[in-house]
Amino acid sequence: VSYTHKIGENVLKDCKDVRYIGMCCSLYSEASSNVDLAYARARGIKVTGIRDYGDAGVAEYVTANLIRRLGGDDGFPPLFGEISEITGVRVGILGMGASAKAVAAGLAAFHADIRYYSRTRKPELEEEKGYRYQELPDLLRECDVICSCLSKNVVLLGEEEFQIMGPGKVLFNTALSPCFEEEAIKKWLDQENTWYFCDTLMGLGDESLLKNNHAVCLKRSSGMTRQAVERLNQKVLDNLGNYCMEQKAL
């Protein structure tokens, strides 16, 4: 089952013989899952997901587009008015899961100043990598670039948050849903020198955003590279094999 297909109670109740669902995508929580996990659990259906297969492509997508924006290589004036390196650019990352860690590592390799906001602090990353935790308002106010790597259906940015961000900023969203309220981002994009990049249409939000030439959507998952598909396939098969072995042992 891919993340593009919703498998709810209305589907599962007509599939009397289903005992196992192997998700070909990440499985973080009931709220973000496209499979009705509560109903599956009540029916005794085992559901497995996979992780850590497409993070490298996401990091490359963010890094490549930021380099173009800082250098003005996309046909618009550079973000800071003159050509800039990533060195010293203040990057605020929302969330600190696997893809966020990959983005942070990629940008840190170019000497970006990495800050992050997460529901739980990551002291080991702060000590080992030198990343800095900030509360959301401070991060939005101080950072030049905001990267949302949040779980699906998590919304953190409303009108107040975009007012704090102000102009002269870049927002990346690589989540599978918008991380913002749609009217709020439209108002923000009406300001001078504001930029929004996302990879999937699921993460874009209202497609009318693309009427603004400062909103750019790749229209495909940046993480689904050739190598990522190979990793995904192997992990799905491993999960299925483990399930079959468990059933054989019963």
Where do the model's predicted regions map?
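C-terminal helix-to-coil terminal segments
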Residues: 41, 46-60, 75-76, 80, ...
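Active-site regions of enzymes building and remodeling cell-envelope glycoconjugates
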Residues: 15-20, 45, 127-135, 209-219
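A short helix->loop->beta-strand "cap" motif at the edges of active sites that frequently abuts
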Residues: 15-20, 42-45, 111-112, 167-169, ...
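Phosphate/diphosphate ligand-binding glycine-rich loop within oxidoreductases
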Residues: 1-74
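Glycine-rich NAD(P)-binding loop of Rossmann-like domains
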Residues: 72-103
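NAD(P)-binding Rossmann-fold cofactor-contacting core
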Residues: 109-127
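Aromatic pocket-lining residues of Rossmann-like dinucleotide-binding sites
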Residues: 106-107, 165
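Rossmann-like adenosine-cofactor binding region
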Residues: 5-11, 121-208
